[in-house]
Amino acid sequence: ERLRGKELADAYNRTGARDEEGRRALLEEMLAALGTRVWIEPPLHVAYGSRTHLGDDVYANFGLTLVDDVEVFVGNRVMFAPHVTVSTTGHPVHPDLRR
């Protein structure tokens, strides 16, 4: 499942600038839910993709990273700045917990 998301994101990132239909089709296959009027500027990076739900009128500037190890829900009319990372998991930051 993880490799599938990465393969689809790679295909998305290789689409032409005018290939709106191809991009939409890849997002529909990659993501759990895709609203209307969603635009994501490549490159897009995902952990899975299949755990991300996007609402209507979502715009993501270049370099969106979705670490969707668990479900990610993005509502309607959301805009992401360049190089945003949405992460549902992480590593311990306290030194004692990292030992």
Regions found by a protein language model. Give the residues of each.
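Flexible, glycine/small-residue-enriched loop-and-beta-strand segment within the central core
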Residues: 44-54, 59-99
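Terminal amphipathic alpha-helical/low-complexity segments used for targeting or macromolecular assembly
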Residues: 1-37, 93
